[in-house]
Amino acid sequence: MKRVFGVFGDPIAHSLSPAMHNAAFSALGMDCIYHAFRVKPEKLEKAILGAEAMGFGGLNLTVPLKETALKLDCIKPDPLAEKIGAVNTVVFGKNGEIKGYNTDGLGAKQALQNAAVEIKGSKIVVAGAGGAARAIAFQLAANGAEITIVNRTEVRAIELAKDISAAALFGNVTGRGLSGLKDLLQNTDVLINTTTLGMHPNIDTSIAIAEDLHPGLTVFDIVYNPLETRLLREAKASGAKTVSGVLMLVYQGAEAFRLWTGIEPPVELMKKTVLEAL
């Protein structure tokens, strides 16, 4: 009997996780299958308990369930997920314990390291102050980066920066509005876009244009549909190094796979599968 894994979210039809994980299971000869399930926030606890009762191997959670999951009595979050305030990976223990993790930040960290970015001591601008920005900023601050969070609503950026600073992490974290981004970027090593600007169908939007950027910059857009966003095109035109959002998707998925199975996943195959599915 196949062991079932899955991703819960709403909407969920667009998810690339089933293709990615099923390719990994198949390559490793594991008798497992991964499905996408549409689950609304108010039904999340019942859905997780039902999955545990039916012997699911593990779960991913996506929008809009990550923050909801942290508040559920049935989930025991690990310290990082608790600090971030969101769970994206659920692991079912043999004794009935349900653990919650957040692999988004680790995925972003690995994507940057893959691009030869030295995170410790780097000056990193994170655009956006939502769940993804929170996970990424926490992880990179914990690894010693100097973080500036910029957001259209300045107060949200400032509040997030205070939250991260209060967690007594190593990096220096500040928050500010989007105005003045161009000047800020002149003394920045990495720009990370966590906003939906540039995402399909609004593919002509971007948080920055080529004249705002410079050749010494690494530009990382977590948006992966389209594969090359306008921001990444502008970055290439400026001579900056670019990092695709596909890498974060794959690396956070690979970390979830390790947590569920204890087995090293075929990361290159997972990446190839996602690229073919886009």
What is the meaning of each model-derived region?
Residues 2-117:
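Phosphate/diphosphate ligand-binding glycine-rich loop within oxidoreductases
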Residues 9, 102-105, 112, 117, ...:
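Glycine-rich adenosine-cofactor-binding loop
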Residues 35, 148, 243:
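Conserved beta-strand positions in the Rossmann-like core of class I SAM-dependent methyltransferases
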Residues 57, 62-68, 131, 196-199, ...:
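Short glycine-rich anion-binding loops that position phosphate/pyrophosphate groups of nucleotides
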Residues 142-146, 238-241:
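Conserved S-adenosyl-L-methionine
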Residues 143-167:
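NAD(P)-binding Rossmann-fold cofactor-contacting core
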Residues 169-242:
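Rossmann-like adenosine-cofactor binding region
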Residues 218, 222-278:
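Adenosine-phosphate binding glycine-rich loop
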